[in-house]
Structure formats: C-alpha cells, structure tokens
Amino acid sequence: MPPTKRFRIQAKNIFLTYPQCSLSKEEALEQIQGIQLSSNKKYIKIARELHEDGQPHLHVLLQLEGKVQITNIRLFDLVSPTRSAHFHPNIQGAKSSSDVKSYVDKDGDTIEWGEFQIDGRSARGGQQTANDSYAKALNATSLEQALQILKEEQPKDYFLQHHNLLNNAQKIFQRAPDPWTPLFPLSSFTNVPEEMQEWADAYFGVDAAARPLRYNSIIVEGDSRTGKTMWARSLGAHNYITGHLDFSLRTYYDEVEYNVIDDVDPTYLKMKHWKHLIGAQKEWQTNLKYGKPRVIKGGIPCIILCNPGPESSYQQFLEKPENEALKSWTLHNSTFCKLQGPLFNNQAAASSQGDSTL
C-alpha cells in the first residue's frame, strides 16, 4: 500500500468550515483566539449559516501576521461548552482573502475581530474584477463602506488614486443635511417688515417650479438679538454660513432652497463669491482648502444678515467710493432691509418661551 499522505498546510490566510456546528459565533471566536500558533493573529471573521437541511455551519477567515505550517489536522477543532462534542473543520489556505471575506459575508450573520489585512492576491481579484468591485462600492450604504470595499478589492487604485476616489465617493454619497429644527414657530415673528415678508412670500409661497430664475437675495441689517437669524433659518431647508465660507461637501449642500449668510464680513465676501452667492448664479466653481475645486450647483438666493457699523454693515460698505460699481450691481440683484426693532413681540415671546431669546 502507498504511504498515507500526511496533512500539511502552509499559509498566512486560512479558511475554515465547520459543518453541523452548534456553537455560537461568539463561542467559536473565543476558542479560535485561544489557539496557539507560531504567528500572531491579525484578523478573524466568523459567519453562521443555516444550510437547507437546517443544520448550522460556521465559516471562518483567519489572517495571520506571517505564514504558518500546520501539520496537526486537529489544531482547529472546537469543543462544545455544554456537551461532549467536538467540531472538526475543513482547513484550506485562502488564496484571495477578499474572495473568502466576501463569501463569509454573504449571509450577514457575522462577527469579526482585528483589522482585515489586504493581500496582493486581492489586487489581482481572484474572482473579483474592477467592474465588480466598483459596482459593489456603488451599492454600498455609506461612503465608509464603499471605500473599504475598494481598499480590500482594488488596493492599487485605493493607494494611487485615493484622493480621486475619496472626492468622487463624497459626491456620490453626499446626504441631505439634517433638517434644522427652529426654536420658535414662524408665527412667533409678528413684526416682520413688509419688504421682508413680501420677499419671503414671493419665493417660499409658490411651488419650486414656479419660482423665478435667479431670484433676488435680501440683505437684512439689524441689531443683535432682534430675531433676524432665527427668522431666516425658519423658512426652509438651507445652508447656514457664518464667519467664513466653507464649500466642502461636509458643510455645503446643493439640494437646499436658499443660503443664510450670517456675520460674514463684507470685505471678505467681496474677495470670495459676492456675485456668485448674492446673484444666485448657477454652476460656478470654488477652490477648497483641502481637495480639488468644486462646482457649486447654485441658483438659490441668499439671506445676508449683518449688524450696523462700519465693519459689518453691507450698506455702509457699498457706500465707499471704490465699491460704486459693486453697489450698482448689488442693488439690481438684492433687496435691502434695515430693522427698526425686534421681529417678534417681546411680551408674547416672554410669556410663551420663558427666558429664551430670539
């Protein structure tokens, strides 16, 4: 008789399958973590799967820091903590960690420990192709999940094109801002000047499709604590810009109805995007501090809020001789309103909101 072939596996990544294994994922993970190997464990992922016959199976991806040589076929046997039963796995070297991880992930009932290790075979894809990977990334539920898929399955692209991948993923997975919840109902503002109310009614009082193209913006000047910010932010979905301009995808959204620009120095706005913003211009480009230039969809008006004074008043700023041409343009593209008092009734606000201020 020919000699019996000895069991021997030499691998850095190991794929284990435990048929008819009644252990929970957590019990299996604890026991596998306790197995002594000649190389440190880096990552373990375990999936529990019910086969057609109703029997539970466990699938395990084990990644190590370096290659190990396994000659003990019983090394990965698991033991039931409640009865006299041993569970012996099928043991294979994992040629493509990404393929095995995808297989283990397929039913979703998983547990993992450590950090998944990208290997060179993942770059060649095994059964993965670039189109498969990018299709999977597009179907991901979040930016983070999409980038992780590409990191695991297309590591060359991830390393060499990370900036482009991140920029594109941010655009694809950009979510609408969480709606801002007004502290006070719009009905609280009972002293809104007629020109402000007319401006708001003409824009927010009609269907979006019926709104005029490049609707004029409005510049509201008034003392602090007159309620102008709360009023402006209570009208609908908006971008809120204060202090400085940040058009990154984290803070500025295209799919809103208007912009609120609050306490932005007019000198600063003149150097940046005065005409783009106040003129509700469409499809304009801005440079980002981090990342490539971004094209802003635009086409929405602004409510600009400012305080009186030579450094903050937009009206005083435009009266300067060097701003004569800008003043003429701004008067054609916006409405000015100077508040004479609070936009709310002090007594009514006090009785309904206690010590709160608008």
Swiss-Prot record:
Residues 156-176 are annotated as: Oligomerization. Homooligomer. Interacts with the replication enhancer protein (REn). Interacts with host retinoblastoma-related protein 1 (RBR1), and may thereby induce the transcription of host replicative enzymes even if the cell is not dividing anymore. Interacts with host PCNA. Interacts with host SCE1 protein. Keywords: ATP-binding, Covalent protein-DNA linkage, DNA replication, DNA-binding, Endonuclease, Helicase, Host nucleus, Host-virus interaction, Hydrolase, Metal-binding, Multifunctional enzyme, Nuclease, Nucleotide-binding, Nucleotidyltransferase, Transferase. It comes from the Viruses. This is Replication-associated protein. Belongs to the geminiviridae Rep protein family. It comes from Beet curly top virus (strain California/Logan). Residues 8-116 form the CRESS-DNA virus Rep endonuclease domain.
